């Protein structure tokens, strides 16, 4: 149980109800700091974007191309940003003939001709915490090789990375560097994920009111809900399932990865949509399985969420069936799901770090033997010959 090590501390250096000394002892200092700093970082990213006078000018002629194809790309957590946002950005493009797709760098690198179209003008938006993952530069270089009219927008937390250096001084490239604090030191991406995610929304579909609601919800979680999340983490689960529909499916995927990473695989995690869960994945639910359903803010979609929740409760097989909703955090409803994803993933990040500490796994370095690394290693990138 976490009750003893997670007792509250009124201390300026505390995060997530843990003192700095405890966080260091548990190998959780950086992860806790980076999770907790997110509302502050969202404000900082927004302020930085408001001061940016060049991104709109660079994008305007590109967004005037009727057949423009935008690819949102990254690897792992960075790839999930595109999965969350692609359909939403599609709705905000100026021309109906333009297209947005989320394609991971890992797919582009292994199957370049399957995903890249030489005769279609393409804006490749690359996400990278460090910008040093082998696939990041390989995807950029393949796009340069195969696409006749290609542009690059690098959204990164590291101004010194390979991706940043490539895009810094080329007219068909734009480097959108986030504040240094978003370059997470810990193993798992937390604030880097949400800040690259937010930057994309600010560029293509800004909504200042929605952002303020997200910040308020995140602050509510960090000041009022930590004890609730801690209790959820104390349940003796061996499996955890995150469910979300539409954009929230990719948030569920990122939540599952965070749980898997921070617990070093000691708790098996899975994700699906509420409707998709019945089509086979529901088989993994047993008395050791926690299920967390991320509720849609759309009344139509929510009917499907509620149906599955009631079904899981009637089945009485799961260890617990938890719900995460806008009402839980604010008492109101109606915020678009792409914005809800920000406070929802914060909740799940906290759940994962608490579970890791309970299992005596260091969240800052959950895999000290090196099978999995903060920046991916061991990837051979081969030349592509047309």
From Swiss-Prot:
Catalytic reaction(s) noted: D-galactosamine 6-phosphate + H2O = D-tagatopyranose 1-phosphate + NH4(+); alpha-D-glucosamine 6-phosphate + H2O = beta-D-fructose 6-phosphate + NH4(+)
Subcellular location: Cytoplasm
Pfam families: SIS (PF01380)
Entry's Gene Ontology BP terms: N-acetylglucosamine metabolic process; phosphoenolpyruvate-dependent sugar phosphotransferase system
A single MF term (Gene Ontology): glucosamine-6-phosphate deaminase activity
Keyword set, alphabetical order: Carbohydrate metabolism, Cytoplasm, Hydrolase, Repeat
Enzyme Commission number(s) of this protein: 3.5.99.-, 3.5.99.6
Domain SIS: 59-217, 222-366
GO cellular component: a single term: cytoplasm
UniProt record similarity statement: Belongs to the SIS family. AgaS subfamily.
Function: Involved in the pathway of N-acetyl-D-galactosamine degradation. Catalyzes the conversion of D-galactosamine 6-phosphate (GalN-6-P) to D-tagatofuranose 6-phosphate (Tag-6-P). It can also catalyze the conversion of D-glucosamine 6-phosphate.
Misc. remarks from the entry: In Shewanella sp., the active phosphotransferase system (PTS) specific for the transport of GalNAc and GalN is replaced by a set of GalNAc- and GalN-specific permeases and kinases (AgaP and AgaK, respectively).
PANTHER family: D-GALACTOSAMINE-6-PHOSPHATE DEAMINASE AGAS-RELATED (PTHR32502:SF3), N-ACETYLGALACTOSAMINE PERMEASE II COMPONENT-RELATED (PTHR32502)
Name of the protein described by the UniProt record: D-galactosamine-6-phosphate deaminase AgaS
Species annotation: Shewanella sp. (strain ANA-3)
Classification of source organism: Bacteria, Pseudomonadati, Pseudomonadota, Gammaproteobacteria, Alteromonadales
